[in-house]
Each structure stands twice: as C-alpha cells, then as structure tokens.
C-alpha cells in the first residue's frame, strides 16, 4: 500500500476489529505491506473487508497485477548456486536444478502467485520479496515442475480482476 506509513493505521484497524492477528508488517517510505493471520479463514477475510470499508474502497478498486518478467534458468551452475544461497535460510538452490525468477507489480501479489505455484508443483521456495514496487520470487526444482509452477503463477495473476495500475 502507498504511502508505506499507512500500514500502521491499517494493521491497527484490522486487529482491533477482528480476531485476526498481525503476521508481518513492513514499512518503507513509498510502499508498505502487512499480513494478518488466523486459524479461521473467515477472520482473515473479515479483516480484509473491515480494512477496505474503513478506507472507503472495494475489491473493484484494486490494481490488477501485471507479470513484469519471468526467467527460467536450467541446470544451475554450482558457483551460481553458491552465490544465490549465500544469505539464504531454509530452502537452498542446488546445482543442477532449474530456477524460476518471476516478478510482478504491485509487489504484494507475488505472495498469491507463490502460493498458487506451490499448490500445483513440487518445488522449493528459495526467496520471496513482496515489498516495494515489484514483487519477486525464486523457485527451484526439476525443469518440468518449474514450468508447471510458472504457468500456475502466471495464470493465477492474469485471472485477477482490477483496474489498470499507475
């Protein structure tokens, strides 16, 4: 969301009006991002409705996501894998695997794309960044699984409705 400082107010609205709890909150000058979590999906959906209502917005006001770049890199070299893994925690890219780099705008939609990719293919999430102007994810796996994940992520983003972005 923009400006980033609005995240403080919006998280406050969501957690005080519902049973959802904050899961992430990142604030930058231009853009900010937040997540709410609950064991009940209804609580999370209610938090979204409450926030939109308080901001005077509806789902129709959202910006339609755009895929801005995709790269599929096959047979990752061991040295490149080492560079990519340097600051990783959790899943790592293994030499010989295939890597997908996908970027979209607005940034927050990358979380949705990643979720849809993980549902359809046996892949590893290496990196996801959903703050700033563009969201980015790096996935790894076999070439076939990465192509399946790529198609699922792109189809999911392209299926979302909204107004054209700025």
Spell out what each predicted region is.
Residues 102:
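Catalytic "initiation/cleavage/transfer" segments centered on a nucleophilic residue
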Residues 31-37, 134-139:
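A generic structural motif
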Residues 37-44, 140-146:
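Helix N-cap motif at beta-to-alpha junctions
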Residues 120, 127, 133-141, 145-152:
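Preference for long, well-ordered alpha-helical segments
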Residues 3-23, 27-31, 39-98, 106-114, ...:
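Positively charged, small/polar-rich N-terminal and surface patches that mediate targeting and assembly
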